[in-house]
Amino acid sequence: DLVNSNETQDEIAAKWNDKKLNESIKLFPKECVYMRWNYKDATQPGHQRILQWYHDKGLKVMGATAASCGSSPFIPRENSLAGYIKGFSKLVAQNQLEGILATAWDDGSPHSETVWRGYIAQGEYGWNPTARTVEAFKAAHAQREFGFHPNDNHMAFLDELEQEAFFFDDALVNSGRRN
């Protein structure tokens, strides 16, 4: 919970015992590229502190976010995680990290097409983290991938499907009788 806390630097330093960490970090190889994984909201204050600490210590670090992760049994959620990807990409630029990549750690769907929009979002925001809004990205994706005119709103069904997927998870997986 230190990563997501709003505690001061001194309070966190006391819990982390960062004097020892600051001494030990000198032993880490400088030629390595270290990965910082975060599949959800990377803009939390603690996570920002960690990225700044890496930068201050001179470590080469890449960000790693997800186009899909374990909460996606058959389709990605939360606009293919585009908001999280955008937020982490901004932090990568601000902290002058080595770059960012998106992974898909979910084998819940046999169709790789279900994660393509997340990968494309990583391309969008990895190159330009201050690019268009997530809604504008979704409209551009629909036009470029499928030829849909943005005003036709043909992709609105995806937003509805994402919301229904949460019901599907609870209705058929958590408890009770399935049949």
Predicted regions span which residues?
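Substrate-binding groove of N-acetylhexosamine-processing glycoside hydrolases
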Residues: 1-179
